[in-house]
Amino acid sequence: MKFKADEISSIIKERIENFDLNLEIEETGKIISVADGVAKVYGLKNIMAGEMVEFENGDKGMALNLEESSVGIVILGKGEGLKEGASVKRLKKLLKVPVGEALIGRVVNALGEPIDAKGVINANEYRFVEEKAKGIMARKSVHEPLHTGIKAIDALVPIGRGQRELIIGDRQTGKTTVAVDTIISQRGQGVICIYVAIGQKQSTVAQVVKRLEEHGAMEYTIVVNAGASDPAALQYLAPYTGVTMGEFFRDNAKHALIVYDDLSKHAVAYREMSLILRRPPGREAYPGDVFYLHSRLLERASKLNDELGAGSLTALPIIETQAGDVSAYIPTNVISITDGQIFLETDLFNSGIRPAINVGLSVSRVGGAAQIKATKQVSGTLRLDLAQYRELQAFAQFASDLDEASRKQLERGQRMVELLKQPPYSPLSVEKQVVLIFAGTKGFLDDIAVSRIKEFEDGIYPFIEAKHPDIFEQIRSKKALDSDLEEKLAKAINEFKANHL
C-alpha cells in the first residue's frame, strides 16, 4: 500500500492541529530545615500568606512566615518522614473546611476530618477558615434570650443570641460544666451547638461527648477536637474551624452556639508556633498579634439583621486563670473583646456554692436587653440583694448583735444563695426559674429552714405541674407576670407550703 506525499502531510497537519498539550506547571521548593512541626522551605517565590502546601509524605502545611529567602510553613499533621531536601508543592489555595448539616452529631479534627469512626462526612459545601467578620450594617443589636438553664446566669448575667460571654476562672471551678449545661439546655430550641476542645486530654473530651450523648445533645452538636497530643498548628486552627461551621448556620437564618474550651491553651499553642517561627516575643513571650488572634475569632460571632435572615452565632469562650488573677495578659485581652464575663471562684466552689459564680465580678453588657420580662420582674433587685448580703455577712463576722432589719436581710440572703445552687447537667426551663426566684425574692421562703430549700425546690415544680399547670403555660406564653398571675403563683406556693412542708 502506497501513501501519497500530500496525504501524509495532511495527516501530520491534522494531528498537529488537534494536539492537546496539557502542561501543568507546579511550583515546588525544598525543605531547608524541619523541627517541632515547622518546616523552613526554600524556593517557593510566589507563595501567598496562609496558602496551603503539600509535602512529599502527603501531609498538608500552611505558609505563615514569608521571608526574603525562605518560607516558614507549619505542618498540619504528624510530619513523619519529612527531612531536609524533601520537596514541597504549592497548592495555590487557602484552607477550606467542610460545613453544613452533615457534620451535626459528629466529632471532627481541626481540618474537619471525622475522628469518631462513624464513616465519611459527605459535606456539600466547603468554606474558608479565615473569613472577615460581618460589618456594622450587617448586624442587629442582641435582643433574643439564649437560655443557659442555669438559674444564677439567666437571672443575673443573662446571655442573648449573638453575644460573646466569657466564662473565666481557675482550673476545677466548673467552667466546662457551665458550657455543657448551656448546650444541653438548647434541646428543642432550634440552636445548633459547636463544642471546640483545644489542648484538652482525650479522656476529658470523651467524657464531654459521653455526657452530651446521655442527654441527647449530640443530635444538634458538632465537636471539634484538637487534643493535647495534636501539633500546635492544629490547636491554633481548631477555633477558626469551629466558627466557620457555626457561621454556615448563622448565614442560613439559623441560630448557633459555639464554646471554645479553652482560649488560654489556644494562646499557648499560638505562642509555641510563633516562637518556633522566630517571631519576636512580647509580654509573657506571646507574639505582638495575640490580641488580634482572639479578636478576629470572637468578632465573627454576631446577630445578623433581618435582610440577611436574622440568624445568630453566640460565643462562649473559656479562659483559665492562675490563682484568680484576672489581670494577666490573656484574660484582660479576652475580657476587653467580649460582651461580659461569668467569673467562677475557687473559694465559692470549695464552700459548696455551685455553680461557683461570683455575682459581684460577673456582668453581661448586652444580655439584659434579651432577658424575658418575667425574669426581669422577679430578679430585678436580686443582684443588689446578694451584694448587700455579702457585705453584711462580712460585717456580721465581727458584730455580735445585729438589728432586726439586718438579721432579716442576712437570712433572706442565705436562702437566695441556697436557691441559686444547682447540680451539674440539670438545666431548668425559664418558667421554673421564674417560679423559684419569685418565691425567694417575695419572701415566701423566709420561714423555711435553709436546709429545706432544696426540698422546697424539688417539690414545687411537680406540685404546680399537677395542680396548677396553667401557671407554667401562662409564663411561657405571656413571658411576663401580671397581677393575676402573681396572685395565682403566691396562692399556689402558700398551698404547697401548707400541705407539703
Swiss-Prot record:
Chain positions recorded as ATP binding sites: 169-176
Membrane disposition: Peripheral membrane protein
Catalytic activity: ATP + H2O + 4 H(+)(in) = ADP + phosphate + 5 H(+)(out)
Gene Ontology CC terms, in alphabetical order: plasma membrane; proton-transporting ATP synthase complex
E.C. no: 7.1.2.2
Alphabetical keyword list: ATP synthesis, ATP-binding, Cell inner membrane, Cell membrane, CF(1), Hydrogen ion transport, Ion transport, Membrane, Nucleotide-binding, Translocase, Transport
Record site feature (Required for activity), residues: 362
Subcellular location field: Cell inner membrane
UniProt KW Protease keyword: no
InterPro entries in alphabetical order: ATP_synth_asu-like_sf (IPR023366), ATP_synth_asu_C (IPR000793), ATP_synth_asu_C_sf (IPR038376), ATP_synth_F1_a_nt-bd_dom (IPR033732), ATP_synth_F1_asu (IPR005294), ATPase_a/bsu_AS (IPR020003), ATPase_F1/V1/A1_a/bsu_N (IPR004100), ATPase_F1/V1/A1_a/bsu_N_sf (IPR036121)
Cell membrane is among the record's keywords: yes
A GO MF label: ADP binding
PROSITE patterns in the cross-refs: ATPASE_ALPHA_BETA
Family: Belongs to the ATPase alpha/beta chains family.
Protein purpose: Produces ATP from ADP in the presence of a proton gradient across the membrane. The alpha chain is a regulatory subunit.
Quaternary data: F-type ATPases have 2 components, CF(1) - the catalytic core - and CF(0) - the membrane proton channel. CF(1) has five subunits: alpha(3), beta(3), gamma(1), delta(1), epsilon(1). CF(0) has three main subunits: a(1), b(2) and c(9-12). The alpha and beta chains form an alternating ring which encloses part of the gamma chain. CF(1) is attached to CF(0) by a central stalk formed by the gamma and epsilon chains, while a peripheral stalk is formed by the delta and b chains.
PANTHER family in UniProt: ATP SYNTHASE SUBUNIT ALPHA, MITOCHONDRIAL
Protein name: ATP synthase subunit alpha
The gene coding this protein: atpA
